[in-house]
Structures are given as C-alpha cells and as structure tokens.
Amino acid sequence: MRKAITILCILFSFNVYSQCVGPQSSTISPLGPYQPGDVVTVNYTLSSFSQVNVNWIHAFELDLGSGWMQNTIVASGNPGNIGGSSGYWLWDNQHTFPSGLNFGPGWRFVHGVVANWGTVSTGPFSISVTMTVKQTCNPEDLHIGVIVYGDCQTGGWNNGACCSDPAYSVYQGNVQPTPITTSNINHY
C-alpha cells in the first residue's frame, strides 16, 4: 500500500510541476563564478512539449538576475519549428501578450494565420544566447532561468486549464567583483 501511495504521489507531483514541458537541459560556458565583464554563453534544449488542452508552445523567456547587462544579450538561431504551424520565431526584448503577460527578453512564436497562437510543433527546441556580466562592485544576482509559455498563458487560446510549468534553472550565483587593492597610507 505504501508503494502505491508513493507511486501516486510521484505521478501527481510530476503532473503538477511539469504539465506541458518535457525534459530540459542546458550548458553554460565558461562555468562560473563570474566577474564583471565576463561573457557567458547559455545553450538550452526543451526535448518535448505536451499540448495539454490543445495548448501550443508560444514563447521562451529568459529570467535573468540584475547582474546581467540586458543590452548585451545576443540570441543565436531560433528554437526551431519542426513540423509546426506556419509562422516564425521572433527575438523580442519586450512584448505584452493579450493576457497582459509582460514578456521579454526571449523568443516568441508569431503564428502565420491566427495572431497570438503558438506553434503545433512538439519539439525538440533549442536556444542559445550570449550575454555579459555587468560592471559592478557589488555581488549582484546572476541567476539564469528559462520560462516556457503556451498560448493558453499568453491569451491566444482558451480551452480549459493552462499549463503552469516552473522556470528551468540554468545558473544560480552572484557577481564576484575583484577586490580593490590599495597601498598602505603613510601619515609621516
């Protein structure tokens, strides 16, 4: 009986915490910790997206700490649209979706037929970004996360419960500022 309850709890928690988003992975180069001016490349892959309630994948948003220079983000390629809907992926620094979701920076899908719908593609999807650590004397937050949105969350589709998947954590850390060294002061 305990085994059955344990299995049910595991299945329930998987369903609650990962409704649409399948396996995710990432690499980061170079490995941290980071100092001001360091340039970092992140590669992220979402292996699959389950279309619960015909909820199509719509966007990949970067969740970044305050220690990153937002104006240095360079996106490479796009997430891909294997067997997907007509349309294209657009890199966007800021966009407000019909649901009121303030989005950016990240990739969002621009559907070729129906505005504000995602793509029917189930993946895999890969993104790559390069960014620079801010010049600072403080240990500012350098977390990096990726949030995946379906068109139900962005307001383009309404067919029952939306997927509510947590952000995927790529990196947790703070800027490691180089200590300022000064010579001894001589009062003679």
Named regions from a protein language model:
Residues A4-T6, T178-Y188:
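Enriched but not universal
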